[in-house]
């Protein structure tokens, strides 16, 4: 009997330590809370178009926006592409392709939409039948989640998307669709 009480106490101590260790392996979304913006960069899909990306995290909601422009100073509006996600959940640390560390995350797709800000943009997408659609219209939001557009398969609404990010002070590198690379586009906290 005298050995049972110390064993019970030791069990509680070990469980308490294990619980604390488990808690440290995940991260809360508060470290991503706020607005993160890139500089004006050449668009990944065209070397004649330019984008400013903005990521806004509020609680477990994440909005990723690409403001597309027709000039290298990003002053002439062309289109806005917006991915809206919910249930953002930050996971454990992972090792990236370059050997550095990042944090894995998952989130759920609410919508993936485009908004043409010029007639030229709407006409170009209609002529190209982008996403299989020829009814893109000026200043009208169009959801293309779940579609394949220009050989890119976009996730459907309610799909779970995985990604990874790396945070260094006020600089953020982030990527969806991969948990081994964060890319090279730098977001700066506003």
Placement of each model-derived feature along the sequence:
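C-terminal amphipathic alpha-helix
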Residues: 172-173
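Contiguous, well-ordered beta-strand patches that form the walls/edges
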Residues: 39-48, 63-169, 179-190
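A generic structural signal for short, solvent-exposed coil/turn residues
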Residues: 9, 28, 54-56, 80, ...
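Generic N-terminal initiation segments characterized by hydrophobic and/or small/turn-forming residues
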Residues: 1, 7-12, 29, 42, ...
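Acidic/polar, low-complexity intrinsically disordered N-terminal segments immediately downstream
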Residues: 20-63
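Bacterial Sec-dependent N-terminal signal peptides
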Residues: 3-7, 12-36, 190
